[in-house]
């Protein structure tokens, strides 16, 4: 997590005033004025438990933020893998500030100087990175409904359109035979009619 110059400077200033090692300390910001000491210790107990033993070294009221800040002294070096970035506390989310690794200080110093020259803050950069790396998820798009009709003779169905046609059930054997018989009788009648026509022509 990246912190601004003000956050790091405030942590160093607090640790220097309390004579504690800044690389073995945390600073918690955003504590409301009406949060007493017992409530505060109960809230931070579980989130800071993975860091080992700790104690509250001191607190200060920040006029600019209208809230309190607390310096937490650890007995062991900061475990960067488990240190919380935020704590859900009374009145909202409390920010946790800690000193970055020593090899990262030079990089962060240059980064902060660059952001200042551009009129930007660390928060601005973090917001842009979140937008670029984690774009808002969009649900699956639904295709618009299309009306499909059976094409006429000589017409081709549109691409992607599904054509529903009524299926005529096949004829069984009895129906086939009956229709075949009707067809034969019809042919015989036609032959007889032709013969009659020929006979009448001869008489004339």
From Swiss-Prot:
Region described as Disordered: spans on this chain: 135-204
InterPro entries on file: PNMA (IPR026523), PNMA_N (IPR048271)
Top-level taxon of origin: Eukaryota
Pfam families reported in the protein's UniProt record: PNMA_N (PF20846)
Amino acid composition bias (Basic residues), ranges on this chain: 182-204
Similarity comment: Belongs to the PNMA family.
Protein name, per record: Paraneoplastic antigen-like protein 8C
Species this protein is from: Homo sapiens
Organism ancestry: Eukaryota, Metazoa, Chordata, Craniata, Vertebrata
Gene transcribed to yield this protein: PNMA8C
